[in-house]
Amino acid sequence: MVDCKSVSTPMELNFRKLSGNSVGPVLENLTEYQQLMGALMFLVNSHPDVCFAVNTLSQHMVDPHHIHRIGARNLLRYLRGTINHALRYTVGSLRLHGYIDADWASNVVDRKSTSECCFTLGSALICWMSRRQKSVALSTAEAEYIAPSMVCCEVVWL
């Protein structure tokens, strides 16, 4: 993968929908896929931009199919293209900022929404979260209303 062609996004569009309909045999070398996912989970600490892709791929560590290997390979190609990118923390005011979003009915299996948030202290990203909501929201507004209550628990922890 050293000389591979890089891609501009860590995950292909509609990958979650495609991977949810996996058919066919499980990958022969299960350990190799699991070790790759472990390494990518460690990498999330310094590359928060791949967090969603790693989360999606790691949900299939027990029974990965060929499409999951393609997704992992795509993620490695993205990382190859961003090898010189870095997070930059500058000195500034130490104000805490939080950003919240909700993805309505994003899970195609149970139609539960996902709440996401991130917090910065000054210009430094100090915490981020992406969690599936426990109840099924009937509208976008309801999903957006549930998200802040989940995030308040995270703020108390900070």
Question: What is the role of each PLM region?
Answer:
Residues 1-158:
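Long, low-complexity, charge-biased intrinsically disordered regions
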